[in-house]
């Protein structure tokens, strides 16, 4: 503990653990995602045999709309989510997370809130919905509202595909170690935003000084593989995957309709992208990328597939996910656009499920709208 919670050694070890966690997630998930997407693509022959008697329009809607979107989201998020949650559960099981909260307590005290917020931020790193629900541990309602409204500034697992793809464009190559460092920097950037907004909200709420943070550091424990796998896979990964798949299917159908219906020689989706080009350029992006963020409202994992589909002008059933950074670069996405996308991905509205959790936990539409607007 003298080393792990030391003023000088503690933050360095914490940052190193984050880098190693992200690096192992990237190394393990890259090939798995390619294999998974390849397996989904090979089902096309089986699908054509089963649906051969269907009307062509219906078969195309099911394959290039519902199925392709759901398969793409699954291939993008399942491997990194499973690996990340397993590694994160190891840190949780050995008793490190309370020590991470102890390291940041003095920072939160200066911001007028409690060190317990660090635990909710760690939960938000996996899923912001879980982080918002975890804000129940905050001792006062004011501190709970502050923690809830700032939790979405921590990039969750669903935003990793966007951060990694744009990060690879910014770096000019796909290097796992450099991307792990970039992810760590994104988390630190989000944490900095959390500290700043927490400080402002604590002043606006005119609350009393934070109550003393009494934290009992649990003893170190040997990791229990069975418990870790059960909690990480069944308790977290499959829960997040099922939520993403449930919203990906109808979103895919809507995307298919917008891509199929032609007006004036252009699809509705392309016309919408052209309409939003002005707003996108103000943010350093373009209309296609902005649409990707808008369609990511149900699930953040939808952003990159939608952006690739618009920029490459291919359907989700034919546009390959592998080499997303190379495809983005080939479509004219430069370093400036990638950098703006990285910043916007860290600081943008929460997903719909997180907004529902915020509405449920706060019981206030005003705080829900504020939490959506703050990032």
Predicted segments, located by residue:
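Extended, low-charge hydrophobic alpha-helical regions
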Residues: 30-69, 111, 131-147, 252-375
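Membrane-helix cytosolic exit motif
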Residues: 193, 197-210, 354-355
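Hydrophobic alpha-helical transmembrane segments
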Residues: 2-54, 60-93, 175-199, 242-252, ...
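Cytosolic juxtamembrane amphipathic/interface segments immediately preceding
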Residues: 1-3, 59-69, 107, 223-239
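Transmembrane helix-loop junctions at the membrane interface of multipass transporters and ion channels
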Residues: 157-182, 353-365
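Juxtamembrane inter-helical linkers in multi-pass membrane proteins
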Residues: 42-50, 98-128, 207-232, 312-323
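Membrane-embedded alpha-helical segments of transport systems
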Residues: 125-131, 150-166, 184-194, 298-304, ...
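Long hydrophobic segments that form regular secondary structure
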Residues: 203-211, 220-264, 274
């Amino acid at each position: 503990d003298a080393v792990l919670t030391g003023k000088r050694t503690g933050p360095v070890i914490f940052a190193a653990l984050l880098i190693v966690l992200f690096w192992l997630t990237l190394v393990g998930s890259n090939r798995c995602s390619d294999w998974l997407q390849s397996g989904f693509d090979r089902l096309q022959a089986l699908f054509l045999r089963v649906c051969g008697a269907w009307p062509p329009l219906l078969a195309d809607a099911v394959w290039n709309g519902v199925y392709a979107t759901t398969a793409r989201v699954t291939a993008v998020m399942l491997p990194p989510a499973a690996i990340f949650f397993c590694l994160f559960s190891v840190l949780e099981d050995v008793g490190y997370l309370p020590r991470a909260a102890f390291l940041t307590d003095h920072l939160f005290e200066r911001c007028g809130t409690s060190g317990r917020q660090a635990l909710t931020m760690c939960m938000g790193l996996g899923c912001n919905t879980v982080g918002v629900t975890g804000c129940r541990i905050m001792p006062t309602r004011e501190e709970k509202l502050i923690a809830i409204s700032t939790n979405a500034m921590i990039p969750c697992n669903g935003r990793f595909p966007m951060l990694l793809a744009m990060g690879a464009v910014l770096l000019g190559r796909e290097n796992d170690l450099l991307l792990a460092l970039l992810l760590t920097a994104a988390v630190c950037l989000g944490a900095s935003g959390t500290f700043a907004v927490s400080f402002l909200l604590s002043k606006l709420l005119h609350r009393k000084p934070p109550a003393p943070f009494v934290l009992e550091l649990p003893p170190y424990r040997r990791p229990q593989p069975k418990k870790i796998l059960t909690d990480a896979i069944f308790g977290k990964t499959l829960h997040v995957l099922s939520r993403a798949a449930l919203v990906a299917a109808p979103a895919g159908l809507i995307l298919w309709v917008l891509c199929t219906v032609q007006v004036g020689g252009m699809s509705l989706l392309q016309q919408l992208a052209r309409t939003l080009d002005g707003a996108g350029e103000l943010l350093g992006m373009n209309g296609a990328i902005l649409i990707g963020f808008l369609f990511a409202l149900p699930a953040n994992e939808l952003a990159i597939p939608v952006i690739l589909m618009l920029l490459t002008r291919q359907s989700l059933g034919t546009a390959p996910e592998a080499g997303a950074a190379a495809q983005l670069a080939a479509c004219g996405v430069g370093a400036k656009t990638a950098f703006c996308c990285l910043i916007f991905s860290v600081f943008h509205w929460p997903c719909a499920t997180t907004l529902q959790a915020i509405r449920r936990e706060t019981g206030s539409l005003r705080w829900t709208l504020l939490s959506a607007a703050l990032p």
